């Protein structure tokens, strides 16, 4: 059965959540309520709920919840599609009004269980190697708003909301908030992996920024040196270096002979500071601009 669905980063998280120990009966019902709000379809006449799940891990957890609550499951179907991503598991179970009596938004233990059910049934997380994004699909606007508020109140997690044509999504972009969310719903092993990935990305990002800075600085230096050489050549061709003031002539000659040296290194040769060399080269460029474009 597992081979029918692609194993994603989200599925690996959900596989870990399958084994989170059950708490009180109220917490179990709260988790089941999360499944109902995200992927449940109530048939009032037959008093059954039909769950349509895209995760086999979530399906196993749901079956365990129903077993704990002694609610029989009447049907389990794996729906097939031409698109492998659209395959899902359909589970029909007996409905009880007690499922809807629980209020999970005012007690942190109940809310955590509710969140676990939401994420297992309607949530996903992208692989943090690429970018940071966790989202949960929800249809009810009121449930979405209450979930967002409780995330802020209980865990100081900032969640956003986006409305699409057929559904609404609650999403979290901050990796810090994502880690708090996952830890709250019971993820442990995957948290360590995510921490390592985040650290690696930070190191790589720091290295890339340093390399980019060095490259940009090298390009600026090369362009500046080329401009200085061009200016000196223009003066040499049009008025002769010998007609420059002595201090400028000395700088021009040393620059021509040492095109690879930095301003600081040129200054050492002439017993001048870097700023003095820079100032004299600017004067040379200004003189050269009389004879042509110095770029």
UniProtKB/Swiss-Prot annotation:
Q: What is this protein called?
A: Probable cell division protein WhiA
Function comment: Involved in cell division and chromosome segregation.
What GO molecular function annotation could you give as one example from this UniProt entry?
Answer: DNA binding
Coiled-coil intervals in this record? none
Domain remarks in the Swiss-Prot or TrEMBL record:
Contains a degenerated N-terminal LAGLIDADG homing endonuclease (LHE) domain, a linker region and a C-terminal helix-turn-helix (HTH) domain.
Q: Which organism is it from?
A: Thermotoga maritima (strain ATCC 43589 / DSM 3109 / JCM 10099 / NBRC 100826 / MSB8)
Q: Which family does it belong to?
A: Belongs to the WhiA family.
Fetch the Pfam families from UniProt. HTH_WhiA, LAGLIDADG_WhiA, WhiA_N
């Amino acid at each position: 059965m597992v081979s029918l669905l692609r194993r994603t980063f989200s599925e690996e998280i959900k596989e870990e959540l399958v084994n989170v120990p059950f708490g009180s009966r109220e917490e179990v019902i709260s988790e089941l309520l999360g499944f109902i709000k995200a992927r449940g379809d109530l048939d009032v006449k037959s008093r059954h709920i039909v769950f349509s799940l895209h995760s086999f891990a979530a399906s196993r957890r749901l079956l365990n919840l129903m077993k704990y609550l002694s609610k029989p499951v009447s049907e389990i179907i794996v729906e097939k599609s031409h698109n492998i991503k659209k395959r899902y598991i359909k589970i029909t179970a007996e409905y009880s009004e007690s499922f809807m009596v629980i209020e999970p938004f005012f007690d942190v233990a109940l809310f955590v269980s509710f969140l676990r059910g939401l994420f297992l049934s309607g949530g996903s997380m992208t692989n943090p190697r690429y970018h940071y994004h966790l989202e949960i699909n929800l249809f009810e606007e009121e449930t979405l708003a209450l979930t967002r508020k409780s995330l802020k109140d209980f865990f100081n997690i900032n969640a956003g909301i986006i409305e699409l044509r057929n559904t609404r999504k609650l999403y979290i972009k901050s990796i810090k908030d994502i880690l708090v969310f996952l830890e709250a719903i019971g993820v442990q092993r995957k948290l360590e992996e995510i921490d390592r990935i985040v650290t690696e990305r930070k190191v790589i990002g720091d290295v890339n920024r340093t390399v980019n800075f060095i490259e940009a600085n090298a390009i600026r230096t090369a362009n500046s040196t080329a401009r200085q050489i061009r200016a000196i050549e223009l003066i040499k061709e049009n008025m002769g270096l010998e007609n420059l003031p002595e201090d400028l002539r000395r700088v021009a000659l040393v620059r021509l002979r040492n095109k690879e040296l930095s301003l600081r290194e040129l200054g050492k040769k002439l017993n001048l500071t870097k700023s003095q060399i820079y100032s004299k080269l600017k004067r040379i460029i200004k003189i050269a601009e009389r004879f042509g474009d110095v770029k």
